[in-house]
UniProtKB/Swiss-Prot annotation:
Pathway: Amino-acid biosynthesis; L-proline biosynthesis; L-glutamate 5-semialdehyde from L-glutamate: step 1/2. PROSITE patterns: GLUTAMATE_5_KINASE (PS00902), PUA (PS50890). It comes from Herpetosiphon aurantiacus (strain ATCC 23779 / DSM 785 / 114-95). GO terms for cellular component: cytosol. This is Glutamate 5-kinase. Its EC number is 2.7.2.11. SUPFAM superfamilies: Carbamate kinase-like (SSF53633), PUA domain-like (SSF88697). It is found in: Cytoplasm.
């Protein structure tokens, strides 16, 4: 596997990995995986964890009551288990002096642009200050999200959210096989997939674990999402010795899915998808130079005028003094807010608005230059 010197990695742990073949959370397996993630951080990599297991943790905490099929029962177990799961993770990562932060998401949070910006800013700030984010779906309030494969899909969306180079989905299955290895002894592991297509989906079948909600089919769906967004994805067995460290070191473990586009191309398409027409931010010559020649973010000081209306999180054009559109980007502030802070210093934003979403009106990572 090609390696960057330092990577941003999303690790997804399924319920089957957390239980390690038992009917409860398996602490030795969890502490070993925590050790590996801590080791990756020590090597300079950034790690985000997407974890299943809240429902199981709740079931364990309540003394393993008889399982019921009602959605509300699952949600109640998730509500009980989420705090317990985070408490366990907090204790395990404390062994390696790794601070953790809990984030509960649904895919709806990542479809709405304002909530997307908020989630992205929170997670990137956590990474910046050395905190390991632990993400789970908000099962206690979600309705149609508690279904097969949701955390697989969520992990791919999170990888895109934080611009991860690598997504690793750990399971009780070692990867994608030519046939179901539990029923066909001649099945062989496929170590590399160039593109997710109908043949790959056919190989996935409906294989899955009874303890979790995800099967191989949903992992292939996640692979399609991740690779289209420019992220390499690997499916591997969670009980494989030192699996995370070996993967990041470049060893071939499990099944690798190659990205079919660059992360930059994918993000540009996403940013441009909802550009607000007949609206723009006019900037001065100094801002033009900072944006086009120095790769800077757009700050209030360089803004001279606001045209049109938009909401926070929408894509707006940036126009030079000669009227030429030089870039587009996700705006951290609504049009009426930009109108109030234009020409101001970043340190004055909070005193002008009474709050602040950050120093940048449009961050360079959320900008497409022309």
């Amino acid at each position: 596997m090609d390696r960057d010197l330092h990577m941003r990695i999303v690790v997804k742990l399924g319920t089957s990995v957390l239980t390690d073949g038992t009917d409860r959370l398996h602490r030795p397996r969890m502490v070993d995986l925590a050790r590996q993630m801590a080791q990756l951080r020590e090597a300079g990599h950034e790690v985000v964890l997407v974890s299943s297991g809240a429902v199981l943790a709740g079931w364990e905490r309540l003394g393993f009551p008889k399982r019921r099929r009602e959605l509300t029962h699952k949600q109640a177990l998730a509500a009980v288990g989420q705090g317990r799961l985070m408490h366990i993770y907090g204790q395990l990562f404390e062994i390696y002096d790794v601070p953790v932060a809990q984030t509960l998401l649904t895919r709806a949070d990542l479809r709405d642009r304002v909530r997307y910006l908020n989630a992205r800013a929170t997670l990137l700030t956590c990474l910046e200050i050395g905190v390991l984010p632990i993400i789970n779906e908000n099962d206690a309030v979600a309705v149609d999200e508690i279904r097969v494969g949701d955390n697989d899909t969520l992990s791919a969306l999170v990888a895109n959210l934080v611009d991860a180079q690598l997504l690793v989905i750990l399971s009780d299955i070692a990867g994608l096989y030519s046939a179901d290895p539990r029923h066909n002894p001649e099945a062989t592991l496929i170590d590399d997939v160039a593109a997710v297509n109908e043949q790959v989906y056919a190989l996935a079948g409906a294989a899955g674990s009874h303890r979790g909600t995800g099967g191989m089919f949903t992992k292939i769906q996640a692979a399609e999402l991740a690779t289209r967004a420019g992220t390499t994805m690997v499916i591997a067995a969670g009980n494989e010795p030192n699996v995370l460290v070996r993967l990041v070191a470049g060893e071939s473990v499990g099944t690798r899915f190659r990205p079919v586009s660059t992360r930059l191309e994918s993000r540009k398409r996403w940013i441009m998808a909802e550009r607000v027409r007949q609206a723009h931010i006019a900037v001065d010559a100094g801002a033009v130079q900072a944006l086009t020649q120095q790769g800077r973010s757009l700050l209030p000081a360089g803004i001279v005028a606001v045209e049109g209306e938009w909401r926070r999180g929408q894509t707006v054009a940036i126009v030079a003094p000669d009227g030429q559109t030089i870039a587009c980007g996700l705006c951290q502030y609504a049009a009426h807010e930009v109108a109030q802070i234009k020409g101001s210093r970043t340190s004055d934003i909070e005193s002008i608005l009474g709050y602040s979403y950050g120093a940048e009106v449009i961050h360079r990572d959320d900008m497409v230059a022309f």
